[in-house]
Structures are given as C-alpha cells and as structure tokens.
Design a protein with these regions (language model features):
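A residue-level marker of the well-folded mature domains of exported/periplasmic proteins
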Residues: 2-3, 7-18, 26-240
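Predominantly soluble domains enriched in secretory-pathway, periplasmic, or organellar proteins
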Residues: 23
C-alpha cells in the first residue's frame, strides 16, 4: 500500500464493509451516535463513506493481502464480522493470508500476530483481547508497515494515523443506553432488576455497561438489586 490516497480509499471501503456487517447483525441504528473514539474523537457514521466504481477497480488492481486476527471466534457476532470481511475482501480482489482466533487469550493473540507478521500482509484487521497486554505486538506490526484497522477497541499506546488507521465500532455506549431505556419503559419506570456483565477490561462491553447504568439514572424508581460479572461465556448461565 505505497500510495497514501489508495490506502485511504481502501480503508474507507473496509470501514464501510465492517460497519455494514455490524448493521446487518443489529448493532448499528440510524440514530444519534453516543459513543466517542478512544481519545474522545467524534464518531462518523458509515453512510458518510463512499467509493466510486473507479476507486474500487483501483483497489482490485493493487494485489493487496490481508489478515484477520480475532479476539474470539466462537459466537455468531464474530462469525458475522469474519464473513463480512471475507466477502468484501473477495469482492475487492484482496487475498486473505490468515484468519486467527485468540479465544480471548492475550498470550495467544500475541503469538497469532507474530505468526501473521511473517506472512507480510498489507492489512491487519483485529480486535485486541487486552488493550495493554497485546500493545507491543501491534506496535511491531505497525513498525513493519502493516496497516492496522482495529475493531471495537484499539491497543493502548498506539497513535491514530501513525500506528493504526482507524477504529471501527458499533455504538457500544449507545446500545447500552438504549437497552436501559427499553427496559425502563417496559417496567413502567418501577421495579427491581439484576445485571449480568462481562467482568474484564474490554472496552466494548465496558461502554455498554456504562450506557446501561446511565440510562437507569433516568428511572429513580428502578433499583439494580444484584450484579454478577463473568469472564467465561460458556459458564455464564451456571453463574446465574
């Protein structure tokens, strides 16, 4: 990806494709965007990004390669994201040289990134399992000239426009806020609720939790009577 204009065009297409996949999965709504970027940047809706047929043809002629390093591949959401990326890369003539699943292990993801780097992809699309523990691996990938697009959260200490191109995300805070509002209205503004949440330092779920709690403040007669965190998705039902 030697040409800066072409890189921007390609990233625009990937950003649109990823957000479109999220929309199809029910994660993006045509409403006010409440979330902000990792440094407080205003979010931009996918509908503002559009490529011409000529630009798409230029991407196809580029002979680019890509790798996808997932944080976890064992649910429908991840499967939808992967399929959306694979379909879009195929349409653009971009070869996928690796798809990895860290199974929510930072150590595994670091190893995955190191393995992927040996394949020298032009593009890396990834969701960090742990924004701190994986940071050095992403920095090494950036230093090697790989263009990184993060999904949902970035790795800590990386600079936008220098170490990575963009963060593509659903409106996680907004989704949590909407969930709280729907629940509050359904209860008629009164009642007791229990909250189950993902108990880890993972920005997307933390933002949804924050949005839900903020929405609950609008319903002073609704009390969160108990909370239960979990770290193992397979054991969530048992903990409940």
């Amino acid at each position: 990806l030697g040409d800066s204009k072409m890189r921007k065009k390609l990233v625009g297409m990937l950003t649109t494709a990823t957000l479109l996949t999220m929309a199809l999965a029910g994660n993006v709504q045509a409403a006010e965007i409440r979330s902000v970027g990792p440094d407080g940047e205003a979010a931009v809706d996918a509908s503002t990004i559009e490529l011409t047929d000529e630009q798409i043809e230029q991407v196809k002629e580029g002979g680019y390669t890509a790798a996808i390093c997932l944080h976890y591949g064992g649910n429908d959401w991840s499967t939808s994201q992967q399929k959306g990326l694979e379909d879009t890369f195929k349409e653009l003539g971009i070869e996928i040289v690796a798809v990895t699943d860290a199974n929510f292990s930072a150590e595994t993801q670091v190893s995955n990134i190191e393995t992927v780097m040996a394949k020298k992809p032009d593009i890396l699309v990834s969701i960090p399992t742990d924004a701190t523990a994986t940071a050095d691996a992403y920095k090494q990938a950036a230093a090697a000239g790989i263009k990184i697009i993060f999904m949902d959260q970035r790795a800590n200490g990386l600079e936008a426009g220098k170490d990575y191109v963009s963060v593509v995300s659903a409106d996680n805070y907004g989704n949590g806020y909407a969930s709280g509002t729907v629940l509050g209205d359904a209860l008629g503004g009164k009642g007791k609720v229990a909250m189950v949440y993902y108990d880890a330092n993972f920005a997307p779920t933390n933002q949804r939790d924050e949005g839900f709690r903020d929405a609950m403040k609008n319903y002073p007669d609704i009390e969160i009577v108990t909370e239960q965190g979990f770290t193992d998705e397979s054991g969530c039902a048992e903990q409940g």
